[in-house]
């Protein structure tokens, strides 16, 4: 009897975790993500260190973000984003091979994995977090569209000290809106994503400027995102032609 109670508690905890995690993923399929664990952690760190707490974040829908920004982050972070199932096995194998001889290990996290980490987990790397990251990545790839994953990613990712998401970055770094970000500005933002605290997209270092140039070139090779629905586009063209005939 003594053994049954702990097992029952453990079973209930596991059941609660699965139900609540699936519920949270379904919830965020439709509802904007206004706060993330990283935002809270960074704010607490600032408070503890005696700094002024800065947390700039404004959610905007995907169609209010410059189309160049998803192209830039795909070119920089995850060029197979539109086609993989959340995990880029080609990059994972490359990273594993390179890490055999490298002191500084390189990762192979996809945009989907980064989104799962940003929205549901904590930033410190560990095998436990990686395990949860795989689980949540599978869930969002199953429950969300690629466009929704990108929308959440561009609205939640850290893009500067106390700055999160495309709209806040556009406002505080470039004095504009997310919709009006230029191609060059989007490439600068993408160039700083590996370390947005160290690198500043508004005042780029020579290294970031070189990365910007590389990303701009790669953007020409990346397929348009989100992919154009041929049937939908055909229907819109037909509608436009009919409207023109009516006007005549």
From Swiss-Prot:
Reactions catalysed, as given in the entry: [GlcNAc-(1->4)-Mur2Ac(oyl-L-Ala-gamma-D-Glu-L-Lys-D-Ala-D-Ala)](n)-di-trans,octa-cis-undecaprenyl diphosphate + beta-D-GlcNAc-(1->4)-Mur2Ac(oyl-L-Ala-gamma-D-Glu-L-Lys-D-Ala-D-Ala)-di-trans,octa-cis-undecaprenyl diphosphate = [GlcNAc-(1->4)-Mur2Ac(oyl-L-Ala-gamma-D-Glu-L-Lys-D-Ala-D-Ala)](n+1)-di-trans,octa-cis-undecaprenyl diphosphate + di-trans,octa-cis-undecaprenyl diphosphate + H(+)
Any one biological process term the GO annotation gives: regulation of cell shape
Ranges where the record places region Disordered: 226-248
Basic and acidic residues bias (residue ranges): 227-240
Transmembrane portions of the chain: 13-33
EC number(s) given by UniProt: 2.4.99.28
Topology in membrane: Single-pass membrane protein
Intracellular or extracellular location(s): Cell inner membrane
EC class of the enzyme, as a word: transferase
Keyword Transmembrane helix belongs to the record: yes
InterPro entries: Glyco_trans_51, Lysozyme-like_dom_sf, PBP_transglycosylase, Pep_trsgly
Alphabetized Pfam families for the sequence: Transgly
Keyword annotations: Cell inner membrane, Cell membrane, Cell shape, Cell wall biogenesis/degradation, Glycosyltransferase, Membrane, Peptidoglycan synthesis, Transferase, Transmembrane, Transmembrane helix
Molecular function via GO: pentosyltransferase activity; peptidoglycan glycosyltransferase activity
Pathway: Cell wall biogenesis; peptidoglycan biosynthesis
SUPFAM superfamilies with a match to the protein in the record: Lysozyme-like (SSF53955)
Function as written in the Swiss-Prot or TrEMBL entry: Peptidoglycan polymerase that catalyzes glycan chain elongation from lipid-linked precursors.
Protein family according to the UniProt entry: Belongs to the glycosyltransferase 51 family.
Listed HAMAP family: PGT_MtgA
NCBIfam families: mono_pep_trsgly (TIGR02070)
Record protein name field: Biosynthetic peptidoglycan transglycosylase
Source organism phylogeny: Bacteria, Pseudomonadati, Bacteroidota, Bacteroidia, Bacteroidales
GN (gene name): mtgA
């Amino acid at each position: 009897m003594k053994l049954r109670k702990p097992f029952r508690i453990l079973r209930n905890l596991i059941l609660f975790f699965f139900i609540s995690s699936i519920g949270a993923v379904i919830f965020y399929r439709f509802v904007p993500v206004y706060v993330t664990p990283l935002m809270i952690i960074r704010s607490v760190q600032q408070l503890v260190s005696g700094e002024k707490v800065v947390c700039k974040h404004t959610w905007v829908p995907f169609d209010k973000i410059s189309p160049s920004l998803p192209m830039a982050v795909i070119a920089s972070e995850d060029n197979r984003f539109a086609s993989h199932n959340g995990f880029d096995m080609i990059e994972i194998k490359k990273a594993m091979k390179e890490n055999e001889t490298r002191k500084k290990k390189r990762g192979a996290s996809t945009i989907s994995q980064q989104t799962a980490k940003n929205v549901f987990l904590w930033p410190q790397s560990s095998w436990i977090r990686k395990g949860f990251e795989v689980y949540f990545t599978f869930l969002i790839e199953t429950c969300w569209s690629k466009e929704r994953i990108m929308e959440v990613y561009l609205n939640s990712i850290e893009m500067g000290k106390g700055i999160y998401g495309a709209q806040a970055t556009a406002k505080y770094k470039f004095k504009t809106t997310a919709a009006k970000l230029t191609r060059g500005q989007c490439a600068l933002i993408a160039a700083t994503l590996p370390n947005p605290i160290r690198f500043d997209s508004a005042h780029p270092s020579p290294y970031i400027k070189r990365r910007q140039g590389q990303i701009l070139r790669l953007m020409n090779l990346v397929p348009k995102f989100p992919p154009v629905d041929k049937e939908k586009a055909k229907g819109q063209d037909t509608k436009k032609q009919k409207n023109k005939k009516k006007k005549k």
